[in-house]
Structures are given as C-alpha cells and as structure tokens.
Amino acid sequence: YSAGEGHMTFPYYTKGGCLAFLYRQDSEYDAYSTKVKEIVASGIYVLFKPLLKRKKIWLVYEKFCSMAQDNGYYFFKYCMENLSDEEKKNIYYVIDKKAPDYEKIKEYDDHIIQFMSLKHVLYVLAAVLYVASDSRTHLYAWRCKTSLIRSKIDKRPIFFLQHGVTALKQVGPLFGRKGSSPMTYFATTSQFEQDIVVKYLDYSEAKSPITGFTRWDVLEDTSTKD
C-alpha cells in the first residue's frame, strides 16, 4: 500500500509466525513487470525443470547483487580462470550491470546474469546451489512484496563463504542452523572457528568445512625483514 512520498507499507508474516508491517521506499521492482517475469519464469521452469536441473547451475553473488569485491567475487574469479570450460559452463555471477563493480567482471560476460532479468528469475529457481558471501535474501529484490519466488529461494542449498570471521561475531540468531537465515554449508577459516560453528551454531563438521576465505588467495606479503 502506498504510504506517500515515495514509500510503501505492507503486512507480512515473520518466520516465527508473527504478523508484522514493513515500511520502505518504493523500488523499481515493485512494478507489475516484475510479477510478469515471475509468472513467465515459473512457467518455463515447470515445463523444462528436468533439463534445467541437469545443467547443475550455480549462482554466485554478493550483497544486494551490486558488488564484486568479497569472497563471492574471488570464488567466481577463481572458477573462471582455473576450471575447464566444461566445469565452469554453468557457473554464473549475478550482479546489476549498472553497479560500478560490474567493470571488474565484465570480461566474463558470458557468465554474468543481469540482476532481476527474466534469466535471473528463472535461474534462481533452476539453480542447484547458491554460493555467496551473504544470505539468500541478497539474491533477489530486497524486501519485495508478495512474491512467487521468494519462498522458493529459502529452500535452495547455499554454500556460505562468509564476509568476516564468525569466531569474532555473534551470528547464531541469524546464521545458526536454527536461526532466521540458516545455511546449508558454512565455510570456516580454521579449526578454532570450525569448533565454534559446530558448538554454537549447530552445524556438523561436514557442513562447516575448513576452506579459508577465497579473498585471502590474493593477499600479498609485503612485510620486510629487518
């Protein structure tokens, strides 16, 4: 419902089953065209689901699908530069091409998907895995109104690359296995951090592999010996 002065408000149910109201600025994705994309993408997905699932699509993204500077970007960059054509053919990075960071990855344009395009909406449904430095929420229009797609995103597997060392933060209520935004896999940086994720966030060791951060791969030792 319009709240005037470029804002809207609408009711929704929280994951705890409580009725809440959201007040936010209007978005270009509130337009009817977004609903049409969702309907068309859902129809295509139903018709071609077996074929799309065989592709084993991975979607990589970062905050608001507007950045390419964290673990998601460096994971994607590694895949593009080190995997064979066959291995990387269905790995895609989702970003708004109007974002400044698009310039950093436009050389991989065949593997870039425009945020909130029809292909993006379709591949959100078809992907077998999301790989990201942020939660599933950042893969779609932020705090959108009633959506055919949003509830399905929450059910898709995600490999959480993190964007900060969890051992230094209290994230259980959000990213814990029983939190409001649980992960399927939770990358950790050390045995110490994995122990914390297992003990306090309730993930198994198999679901919280010690991988380090992909962005650490590009760190350079600039120290000098005196």
Ranges and model annotations:
Residues 1-57:
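Basic, ligand-binding patches in group-transfer machinery
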